[in-house]
Amino acid sequence: PRVMSVGRLDFNTEGLLLLTNDGELERYLELPQNAWLRRYKVRVRGTVDRKKLEPLKGGVTIAGIRYGPINIEIERDGKGNDHWLIVSIREGKNREVRNIMAFLGLKVMRLIRVEYGPFVLGDLPPGGIEEVSQGLLHSCLRGFFGERGP
């Protein structure tokens, strides 16, 4: 069977990538109306202006593209201009996190997807693979399985 990725990660992005051989499940997980939370750890270089973060919770338009609500928390202030942020979005548009960081005047040094909906990267090492149990799938995706049956 063909293996498909749910969503995508840019070439310079690392972290959680969901794989499936079920095309309907892949589509369900990507549907914008399901608004799965995507959470990223982002190492940035630059000055983080906390006053600019709060308005992003209502969304923002950058270069004619409307981005929905964006929540940014400062996880760790680094030395000088290095900082780790936690960015939470629900749309996952192409290069969304990078575009938002550029809008804030920040340069992305590292971008790691750590959550996609109910699925969490946790301690899985780079290149590691973990099968999602049927029980977890059914408990997290009741809407999907309710339509198709188990």
Where are these regions (language model features)?
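Basic, flexible Lys/Arg- and Gly-enriched helix-loop patches that mediate nucleic-acid binding at interfaces
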Residues: 1-150
